[in-house]
Amino acid sequence: MNGRVDYLVTEEEINLTRGPSGLGFNIVGGTDQQYVSNDSGIYVSRIKENGAAALDGRLQEGDKILSVNGQDLKNLLHQDAVDLFRNAGYAVSLRVQHRLQVQNGPIGHRGEGDPSGIPIFMVLVPVFALTMVAAWAFMRYRQQL
């Protein structure tokens, strides 16, 4: 295995209506607080339960927000991005980049520790038991063979 992780990157327009607790998410990033190495973008750090973003369901933690109401978020200080969100109005349009991890390896491959795979002992115990029975039968009946 080469250790490479592949991602499928998609973009989506998400329209939110500001609720009593704002837009319902927190952000990280900016030119002064890089969240991702060599990327000064603005990312969703937390979705607030029952907030506008959670009720909509499309915005996810880790999503990169590219623009707010058509205004690009590139090369902004963190506080400038926060101010942009706070002053965005009641109806807010977000251009968002989702990164989905893509399976790396052959089809049907299970990663180590994957709970949906069959545990190794579930295979080894029956194989060991069958081997023991075969060895016992061979020893018991070898004179008759």
Curated annotation (Swiss-Prot):
The record's section on SMART domains has: PDZ
The record's section on Gene3D superfamilies has: 2.30.42.10
Q: Which residues lie on this side of the membrane: Mitochondrial intermembrane?
A: 139-145
The PDZ domain covers which part of the protein? 13-100
Q: Which domain of life is it from?
A: Eukaryota
Q: Which residues lie on this side of the membrane: Cytoplasmic?
A: 1-117
Q: Name one GO biological process term.
A: regulation of Notch signaling pathway
Listed A to Z, the keywords are: Membrane, Mitochondrion, Mitochondrion outer membrane, Transmembrane, Transmembrane helix
Q: Name one Pfam family in it.
A: PDZ
* The keyword Nucleotide-binding is assigned to this record: no
Q: Which GO cellular component term is one of those annotated?
A: mitochondrion
* Primary location class: mitochondrion
User: Where does it localize?
Assistant: Mitochondrion outer membrane
Q: Which residues cross the membrane?
A: 118-138
Record carries keyword Transferase = no
Quaternary structure and partners: Binds (via the PDZ domain) to isoform 2A of SYNJ2 (via the unique motif in the C-terminus). Interacts (via C-terminus) with RALBP1. Interacts (via PDZ domain) with ACVR2A (via C-terminus) and ACVR2B (via C-terminus). Forms a ternary complex with ACVR2A and RALBP1. Interacts with MAPK12. Interacts with DLL1; enhances DLL1 protein stability, and promotes notch signaling in endothelial cells.
The role this protein plays is: Regulates endocytosis of activin type 2 receptor kinases through the Ral/RALBP1-dependent pathway and may be involved in suppression of activin-induced signal transduction.
Protein name (record): Synaptojanin-2-binding protein
Q: What is the gene called? A: SYNJ2BP
